[in-house]
């Protein structure tokens, strides 16, 4: 079995993949996945909101923005180092081997909050787990210090296509997102970068977002695929629910475009049937977020996920630290 790593996919080619009959798309994705990732296993990642609410950004989907009126927009102080590490230990005991930490910031703040972040990264790495941080934009020096602390990956999503982006956020440009990703790469930290469907975008928008990701050289090591969780008090609160099979198509297409990336089944999974989630695994998803909360939105509980993987006949990387994001 062979596959090709490409960075020259066109939007038209990607849209054609998204429009394939579902069974044909799944077959192609599974072929690429088996060729690129022998010994298929699912990585379990746990996600913790270290600093919740009070974010200056105006992302239309986000419950943590000060511009929105959800229940979690009020500022909460950053968690202390030891409670975060206690949560990391608990995540490891539950089977996760990657611990992701989120800060509701526009950009990383220097000083005590950043020093605490570095201590958290070191502590997670000392547990033998991968450490991922998502905290908005950052400087070259901050990226370098995170790399020195042992950070495995930095998450900074594109959210949507360049064409649809201004309908979702106005406080940060698409170019600023790309520049943040470049700083992370320059520091030697792996990228976790994906997007969200169900925000009123077109099929071409989805293809365009995937084209930006697939054009990166190298591809992002981790590609989270999210479905919108419509939160009361946000501009997208009345958005119609995304169609689960559309998320399956996004997973499959991401797998074809970026054969060796970890395609992460992320937010929105709680609203999907077990069968739709298993189809996502069949389509090439090889990571799930594990635990009953993703930052501020719900997620299937640990026991439900254990049963899901068992029923699918999929092995997880229980407490095995991987070298890729």
Curated annotation (Swiss-Prot):
Catalytic reactions of this protein: (4R,5S)-dethiobiotin + (sulfur carrier)-SH + 2 reduced [2Fe-2S]-[ferredoxin] + 2 S-adenosyl-L-methionine = (sulfur carrier)-H + biotin + 2 5'-deoxyadenosine + 2 L-methionine + 2 oxidized [2Fe-2S]-[ferredoxin]
Similarity comment: Belongs to the radical SAM superfamily. Biotin synthase family.
Protein known as: Biotin synthase
Residues bound to [2Fe-2S] cluster: 100, 132, 192, 264
Sites where the protein binds [4Fe-4S] cluster: 55, 59, 62
Cofactor info, note text: Binds 1 [4Fe-4S] cluster. The cluster is coordinated with 3 cysteines and an exchangeable S-adenosyl-L-methionine. Binds 1 [2Fe-2S] cluster. The cluster is coordinated with 3 cysteines and 1 arginine.
Keywords assigned: 2Fe-2S, 4Fe-4S, Biotin biosynthesis, Iron, Iron-sulfur, Metal-binding, S-adenosyl-L-methionine, Transferase
Residue span(s) of domain Radical SAM core: 40-269
Keyword set includes Iron: yes
Pathway field: Cofactor biosynthesis; biotin biosynthesis; biotin from 7,8-diaminononanoate: step 2/2
Function field: Catalyzes the conversion of dethiobiotin (DTB) to biotin by the insertion of a sulfur atom into dethiobiotin via a radical-based mechanism.
Domain of life assignment: Bacteria
Enzyme Commission number, as recorded: 2.8.1.6
Gene Ontology BP, a term: biotin biosynthetic process
Record text on subunit structure and interactions: Homodimer.
PANTHER family: BIOTIN SYNTHASE, BIOTIN SYNTHASE, MITOCHONDRIAL
Species this chain originates from: Parasynechococcus marenigrum (strain WH8102)
One Pfam family matching this protein: BATS
Cofactor(s) demanded: [4Fe-4S] cluster; [2Fe-2S] cluster
One MF annotation (Gene Ontology) recorded for this entry: biotin synthase activity
Highest classification ranks of the organism: Bacteria, Bacillati, Cyanobacteriota, Cyanophyceae, Synechococcales
InterPro entries hit by this protein: Aldolase_TIM, BATS_dom, Biotin_synth/BioAB, Biotin_synthase, Elp3/MiaA/NifB-like_rSAM, rSAM
Classification via Gene3D superfamilies: Aldolase class I
